[in-house]
Amino acid sequence: NLQQAMHGDRVTVRVDRVEGKAEGCIVRVLERANDELVGCYHVDEGGAGYVASLDPRVTTPVQVPSGTTGGAKPGQMVAVRIEDWPTPTSGLVGRITEVLGALEDPGVDTELIIRQYRLPYLHNPAAVAEAERLGAEITARDVVGRTDFCPLTTVTIDGDTARDFDDAITLETLPNGHHWLGVHIADVAHYVKEGGALDEAAYTRGTSVYFPERALHMFPAPLATGLCSLNPGVDRLVQSCLMEIDRRGAVVRYELHDGVIRSDARMTYTAVEAMLTLRDPETRRQHAALVPLFERMETVYRRLHARRVRRGSIDFDLQATQL
């Protein structure tokens, strides 16, 4: 009843009634879902090459004629493009387009995942060109009408292995004893115009994808690791929310700004814990200029936490798995 249809294909189905139950029979394949598969290359006893797909839903091996193996060796992981779809008298036929390497080789597992799930790993040339035209630094024109937060001590705080630094914080003490907390988010929208190549690329990708040893960023590098990365020592455009927090942890007023910041340091949760909780002398010496800032942050945290407890909030401390 499958009529050579494969997983994900769009098909026309005829529905029959068999003993009172509906039963379908595929009449025609309208659109093939996948014209490229990843799998392991093998050679059978007769010397014929084929690829066994890693997708358990694709049970038919892909025959690879001589001369289209791309130099693959038995046991290597490969990408294979389907040249001929199955018929009642023949199976899948394809040619190897890329040899990824042995499964145990470093990075091959990542390459397999990227191709198996068809993750876009190359940026559209138009999007790259649009990003490169933006330049490497912000200009005087970019900052017109923006609030300058550069004089404030500013830090990013992320995990040890973080690759994106797109949010930063500032914290000042007001004369009334309240705190003035600033949360600053990289202003991506300043650079990405609706309908442009970058906008279309971001819409297609939808998100960044992170692997242990690499990242597939939603935007090309000039934005992802450049203008929209809040690296220390460089001016960056941000969207800022400034909040006045009273002694009981309540936000009594707030302001929104188009801003400019200059991060003073890239901090990690590990370093902050060593500074505040463990009170490690070396960490406190290394970041001596920032210790007062983080002690203020700890004060605000305790006020916010106490307010959450009074409201009956539940905090789930879930362990994150790392490989």
Q: Which residues are covered by each model-predicted region?
A:
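Core structural elements
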Residues: R302-L323
